[in-house]
Amino acid sequence: RSETGKRLLTLPNLLACLIILLGVSLIGYFILFPAWGYFHSDCTDTILWAQAGYDAGGLFNADFTYACLLPFGGQLLMQPFIGLFGVSTTTHAIGMLLFLALFVTAAVCFCRSMKWSMSWAAIMVTALLLLLSSSEKLREIFWGHIIYYSLGILFLLVGLALAFSTLNAMEAPGGLFTR
């Protein structure tokens, strides 16, 4: 039960979780298996940036030429695993799965900050995941490597979730807009 006394484990909530699980499973399957048939030089940037940072012992390597400098880029998700698995498909897959988890979390938080039910949030998140996987180029951009395209959407979801949450707090009883 939640703090308001409502049951959390209801049939709609259970179905919502299954819907999101279906979408995440499809993308996770793509990241772990078919993606390697589409892996090419455009997909290597994130893992090579992670290796450069790992070799330098920091976030960035002064001796490495970056195509674009992303202080909150995907290399941060892969860099800890370079020491364990090296520059490998395992490291890349772990980083991409972590990005998927962050992306789904941000999308769910965005929907919930707009006061959508969990059922509608699940439908929207799954539809978003499937839409972003609808072509070979979109799959490469979002699930093949982590660069400003995919990070832009992630940061947009996080920023909007924070904005809506702030507005909700200000409109709540005792909030800034209710005085």
Describe each model-derived feature in a short phrase.
Residues G58, L76-L98, F103, M114-W116:
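Juxtamembrane segments of multi-pass membrane glycosylation machinery
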Residues T46, H92-F99, H145-L156:
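Alpha-helical transmembrane segments of polytopic membrane proteins
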Residues L11-F39:
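Transmembrane signal-anchor helices characteristic of membrane glycosylation enzymes that use polyprenol
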Residues S165-R179:
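Short hydrophobic alpha-helices at membrane interfaces in multi-pass membrane enzymes
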Residues E3-I19, S117-M118:
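N-terminal membrane topogenic signal
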Residues A67, P71, M118-L167:
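Membrane-interface micro-motifs in multi-pass membrane enzymes
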